[in-house]
Amino acid sequence: MGRGAGREYSPAATTAENGGGKKKQKEKELDELKKEVAMDDHKLSLDELGRKYQVDLSKGLTNQRAQDILARDGPNALTPPPTTPEWVKFCRQLFGGFSILLWIGAILCFLAYGIQAAMEDEPSNDNLYLGVVLAAVVIVTGCFSYYQEAKSSKIMDSFKNMVPQQALVVREGEKMQINAEEVVVGDLVEVKGGDRVPADLRIISSHGCKVDNSSLTGESEPQTRSPEFTHENPLETRNICFFSTNCVEGTARGIVIATGDRTVMGRIATLASGLEVGRTPIAMEIEHFIQLITGVAVFLGVSFFVLSLILGYSWLEAVIFLIGIIVANVPEGLLATVTVCLTLTAKRMARKNCLVKNLEAVETLGSTSTICSDKTGTLTQNRMTVAHMWFDNQIHEADTTEDQSGATFDKRSPTWTALSRIAGLCNRAVFKAGQENISVSKRDTAGDASESALLKCIELSCGSVRKMRDRNPKVAEIPFNSTNKYQLSIHEREDNPQSHVLVMKGAPERILDRCSSILVQGKEIPLDKEMQDAFQNAYLELGGLGERVLGFCQLNLPSGKFPRGFKFDTDELNFPTEKLCFVGLMSMIDPPRAAVPDAVGKCRSAGIKVIMVTGDHPITAKAIAKGVGIISEGNETVEDIAARLNIPVSQVNPREAKACVVHGSDLKDMTSEQLDEILKNHTEIVFARTSPQQKLIIVEGCQRQGAIVAVTGDGVNDSPALKKADIGIAMGIAGSDVSKQAADMILLDDNFASIVTGVEEGRLIFDNLKKSIAYTLTSNIPEITPFLLFIIANIPLPLGTVTILCIDLGTDMVPAISLAYEAAESDIMKRQPRNPQTDKLVNERLISMAYGQIGMIQALGGFFTYFVILAENGFLPSRLLGIRLDWDDRSMNDLEDSYGQEWTYEQRKVVEFTCHTAFFASIVVVQWADLIICKTRRNSVFQQGMKNKILIFGLLEETALAAFLSYCPGMGVALRMYPLKVTWWFCAFPYSLLIFIYDEVRKLILRRYPGGWVEKETYY
């Protein structure tokens, strides 16, 4: 009581602390979720279970009690995460990142116009136009980006489709169908093949029940479900069924132990929606760029503000100048350019099977330095295939070609005939109907993955399995179960009208225990020690390849004792199941996709670390990792070194092993420091038998190392990791809806190789955005300098606001976008991933090149044209200095030029606007050269060539647009742009040529002296 009372006066309990408390609370909850599932229901006996949930295990709950629990716990549904309202998303597009800069510009323009309107009788409307145009640019681009991204991000909607609609419960001893949302803890539920499990269940009885847990644990094989407690870990024990997994075959009854958000699936959902998502690398780059540009703008603005006060301008005029300079620094067209470039790349990636959900993720993929890939279905084909067989004391590779051209053994061997017969008959898998025209390997089957693999293998090498089964009809069968680990069936023999054959398959060591002889070259010989050793070696060799091995045996039943029509009893066995004849082994694997080894190799040369994270067995995981090159030739794990030196693993120095296979159970006990140690010191890592929460821990570990992490995944279990990663990649075909929602990108063909294509596109767009920005920024200098000289030298204004807009939003747009289509200069995939700390999109060197070098040459070209035109009209440069006040004075209609001619205000203005038009045309001419030099950053343009058709179109388009603006009748009234003499177009040509030569020489020095002074100062 005392503590509670004292709390009110505690000054420390401010709101800030509470805010912090909330955040800490959330972090604590997330940490809780990251831990493994804690429950003990799988360990309880049925009586204890009934007592715990106060339920009669045969009659179920009473209706009244179910109502009470429903009122207490709420419906059995997942809480949808807080979604961002659409208007907020739209506002983010309008006011995020780059747009802020343009909004500030627009507001400053309106401010300047307001000041002018208050001071002058007839204010010029330039600032008003500029403000309106800036606002329009932001709004149009914002709508465009919003439209591009509106097709995404609704994480939980997909969980909704996963929730089963109906459930079959037993209440008060009666079966009833109810809505799955009304299922409560303690309910007695029945599930059958084809159903979705309505909540987390503890099985109390089952008949051949198998569930598909792949979306939860990543195990592709259907898992048997029975009442026995088989494993400490609730995710692996047989007597628990999980919410929203599928029951594949059989039936089961169970007691509900968790509903809604408290289920294992619910925890994952909460985990995924509660994760903080970091900003994308490109968003940080654009922010950095805005800081740079704003810095330059404010520096110039303030310097000239002070200068104009010193030169004797009034305060208000100086403020107008300040605003004018800041606005002139804003690259109006760049926002649209960046958005369009990213969109184009996104479209290009979609054609290559990478569907990008938000535009910024396009570039993130390019800066990726670590890929954590799922094994099943991404690196492998997710189709079990027979890989090897062992018979006649030899290991043979299976031939999986359609035309059987790759046969590595003699198909006439009588042992092979016997083995193929057992594999075909002792097999419940069948092809689904109507697939006669599809190649065997691509046909859909009904049945378990291993049996389907055997079915396809035998169909390919021995012809129709259905006909084989018709010729040898089945008379009895014992299906596979986990206690005796074999499957057995008895068939009438086609080659003997009276007798039967018993065929059996199962775990190799169990099958061998039941055999007394072995079939070699078609003859039965006794199973001696030598043959048992041969079997053991073959079994170990195939198992070591990560393959799933099955043993096969048979027994020809004597027709005297078992004539046709004999009633075989599979419960009270009235036939022999011992002293059988062993025939051979067959091993299966989910083979790697064809394009993966090459893709992993490309990642390696691109400096990207590929880590395999799988729920599968370590041996299988390691075998596939070696098969696809994640563990490369000659690299050993600690276990390999120990085996080679014949010493215990504990004596091997872990630093000596380049590769490393980490078991999920070891990972569970590791501190984050130990995990960091592994990630730092091993180049090639495989995590096996991992849980969904661990995937998240691995991603966070990589991010602590400063890596930009891409994660692939297809199950619900992957969604937290997909969301946490810098870029989450979901599978389009096999992926669950949830994983697709959590991801930033979807692989339409589920192929790891497509990721590598995506990385290449991402790196290319980063390079090309640099080029686009360099091109766009350069014309800022010839746009700002006229204004500065107008202030300092008091000359008539050389370039007006309207003409600046014609450049930024007119002639420069298409060329800037065309650079997005530029091909890579060198092999992008041979260099290291970019370092986000040092390799920026826009750096000081790019600004110095654009503003300080190329921009200056462009400005000279513009001023040259300006002075030429005024001189031709009689105003020599010496006469222009200090003429501004008289020139802009409306009442002065007799201003003399250098030759004594008098000019009225209107005549002067026509000459001035003709100068604006010519200055504009000069900028277009020098931007030709700028566009061509921006094609490359290191290579010569002659090496790169002019293959970019869009770029050539851009050159023609900007020239045509400039000519149209100058010569179109009526432009003099609309935009105050006047027709030019043809010769005036040529004034800027020498400057254009100078830019081209200057830059080619710079790049030549760059290539000759890599790492030298020129590279340090000018290579952006």
Swiss-Prot record:
Ranges facing Cytoplasmic side:
6-85, 151-286, 337-769, 821-840, 936-948, 1004-1020
Give the EC class as a word.
translocase
User: Could you tell me which residues belong to the region Disordered?
Assistant: 1-31, 212-231
In the UniProt record, the gene name given for this protein reads ATP1A2
Which residues are involved in binding Mg(2+)?
A: D714, D718
> Which domain of life does this protein belong to?
Eukaryota
Composition-biased stretches (Polar residues):
212-227
Q: Which residues form the active site?
A: D374 (4-aspartylphosphate intermediate)
- Coiled-coil stretches noted in the UniProt entry, renumbered to this chain: none
* Enzyme Commission identifier(s): 7.2.2.13
Extracellular membrane side: 107-129, 307-318, 790-799, 864-915, 968-982
| Residues with the Phosphothreonine modification | T570
Annotated GO molecular function terms are: ATP binding; ATP hydrolysis activity; metal ion binding; P-type sodium:potassium-exchanging transporter activity
InterPro entries in the record: ATPase_P-typ_cation-transptr_C, ATPase_P-typ_cation-transptr_N, ATPase_P-typ_cyto_dom_N, ATPase_P-typ_P_site, ATPase_P-typ_TM_dom_sf, ATPase_P-typ_transduc_dom_A_sf, Cation_transp_ATPase_P-type, HAD-like_sf
Query: What family is this protein classified in?
Result: Belongs to the cation transport ATPase (P-type) (TC 3.A.3) family. Type IIC subfamily.
Point out residues bearing the modification Phosphoserine: S10, S439, S450, S559, S587, S672, S826, S940
According to UniProt, the reaction catalysed is:
K(+)(out) + Na(+)(in) + ATP + H2O = K(+)(in) + Na(+)(out) + ADP + phosphate + H(+)
Q: Which UniProt keywords apply?
A: ATP-binding, Cell membrane, Ion transport, Magnesium, Membrane, Metal-binding, Nucleotide-binding, Phosphoprotein, Potassium, Potassium transport, Sodium, Sodium transport, Sodium/potassium transport, Translocase, Transmembrane, Transmembrane helix, Transport
Q: What does this protein do?
A: This is the catalytic component of the active enzyme, which catalyzes the hydrolysis of ATP coupled with the exchange of sodium and potassium ions across the plasma membrane. This action creates the electrochemical gradient of sodium and potassium, providing the energy for active transport of various nutrients.
Name of the protein: Sodium/potassium-transporting ATPase subunit alpha-2
Q: Which SUPFAM superfamilies match?
A: Calcium ATPase, transduction domain A, Calcium ATPase, transmembrane domain M, HAD-like, Metal cation-transporting ATPase, ATP-binding domain N
